[in-house]
């Protein structure tokens, strides 16, 4: 009887075979909610999106990056793989990138959409970051989407340009990447450019961000007229008027009354209908006035308390009246 030959597999081959056989199936978590639009020929950093959602008890052994349907030779893993870097991207680097995290028992992956565009006036709105400040206030303009580049470098070199208002003393860069604007004016609106100097290896690259600054109309706070106190008697019919004046751009407010945790609104009577609210509105070219009348009929001893007239708007305002009974 012949003895079948014994086949000895190299240890490394056997180990690889077992690992491949036992490798967990990778869970596809879909595409990250945010898309990335970056400039051609400037460094791009993409984050591994599922890193921040992984529980503390999960031990990651490997973080891998790949581009769907293409070679991965343009991808540079950085920060222990939690981010990926492309140094000189071209429009051909646009596409879907996948971050894979795994250990011996678990694997998941999530994709990100990257679009590389050139700098031109025709697509400036596509690549700019809109920021909003209010007229006649102190506002801030921030160089956006640069945290991954500066990391622990709190003294990053960031230069602003592109708008003549940067020469005005009201605009000051007190913190790297942040412009403080004192007494914001309408003509502060426009496009601003900030450039970060990023060093990788022995070479320095420009990272450019364009901010589209919008200035909202000056917010004029509403005014309210309400007496500090009123004197009445039990059994009488009492009406207290609260007058709210609004100026553009604020043209609407929800006006109601509060007392001892109870809310009194128009068309909403209390249990016995003794306390009610009626609102009247009139409008002119320059303002809108809401007169809210709190009606108590008849007055009872329990009404000797405070009632607050509240105008819910931006910004909100309130005043309180005290009812005294003689």
Swiss-Prot record:
Signal sequence region: 1-18
Keywords in alphabetical order: Disulfide bond, Early protein, Glycoprotein, Host-virus interaction, Immunoglobulin domain, Repeat, Secreted, Signal, Viral immunoevasion
Major site of localization recorded for this protein: secreted
Listed InterPro entries: Ig-like_dom, Ig-like_dom_sf, Ig-like_fold, Ig_sub, Ig_sub2, IL-1-bd, IL-1_rcpt_fam, IL-1_rcpt_I/II-typ
Keyword Phosphoprotein: no
Gene Ontology biological-process entries: symbiont-mediated perturbation of host process
Protein location: Secreted
UniProt GO MF annotations: interleukin-1 binding; interleukin-1 receptor activity
Stored SUPFAM superfamilies: Immunoglobulin (SSF48726)
Record carries keyword Membrane: no
Superkingdom field: Viruses
Subunit structure of this chain's protein: Interacts with mouse Il1b.
Task performed by this protein: May reduce the host inflammatory response by interacting with inteleukin-1 beta (Il1b) and thus decreasing the association between IL1B and its cellular receptor.
Name this protein carries in UniProt: Interleukin-1-binding protein
This protein's encoding gene: OPG201
């Amino acid at each position: 009887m012949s003895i079948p030959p014994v086949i000895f597999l190299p240890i490394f081959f056997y180990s690889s075979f077992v690992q491949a056989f036992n490798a967990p199936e990778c869970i596809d978590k879909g595409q990250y909610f945010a898309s990335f639009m970056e400039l051609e020929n400037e460094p791009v950093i993409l984050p591994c999106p599922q890193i921040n959602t992984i529980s503390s008890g999960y031990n990651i052994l490997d973080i891998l990056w790949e581009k769907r349907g293409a070679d991965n030779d343009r991808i540079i893993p950085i920060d222990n793989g939690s981010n990926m870097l492309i140094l000189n991207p071209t429009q051909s680097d646009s596409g879907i990138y996948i971050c894979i995290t795994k250990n011996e028992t678990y694997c998941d992956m999530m994709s990100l959409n990257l679009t590389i565009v050139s700098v031109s006036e025709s697509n400036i709105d596509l690549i700019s970051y809109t920021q909003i400040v209010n007229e006649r206030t102190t506002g801030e303009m921030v160089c956006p989407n640069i945290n991954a580049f500066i990391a622990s470098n709190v003294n990053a070199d960031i230069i602003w340009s592109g708008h003549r208002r940067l020469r005005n003393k009201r605009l000051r860069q007190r913190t790297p990447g942040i412009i403080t604007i004192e007494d914001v004016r309408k003509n502060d609106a426009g496009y601003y450019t900030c450039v970060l100097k990023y060093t990788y290896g022995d070479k320095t690259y420009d990272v450019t961000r364009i901010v589209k600054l919008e200035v909202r109309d000056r917010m004029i706070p509403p005014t309210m007229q309400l007496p500090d106190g009123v004197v009445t008697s039990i059994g009488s019919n009492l009406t207290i008027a609260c007058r709210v004046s609004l100026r553009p751009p604020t043209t609407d407010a929800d006006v109601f009354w509060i007392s001892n945790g109870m809310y009194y609104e128009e068309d909403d009577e209390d249990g016995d209908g003794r306390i009610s609210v009626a609102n009247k509105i009139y409008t002119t070219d320059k303002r809108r006035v809401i007169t809210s009348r709190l009606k108590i009929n008849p007055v009872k001893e329990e009404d000797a308390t405070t009632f607050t007239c509240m105008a819910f708007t931006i910004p909100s305002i309130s005043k309180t009246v005290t009812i005294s009974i003689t």
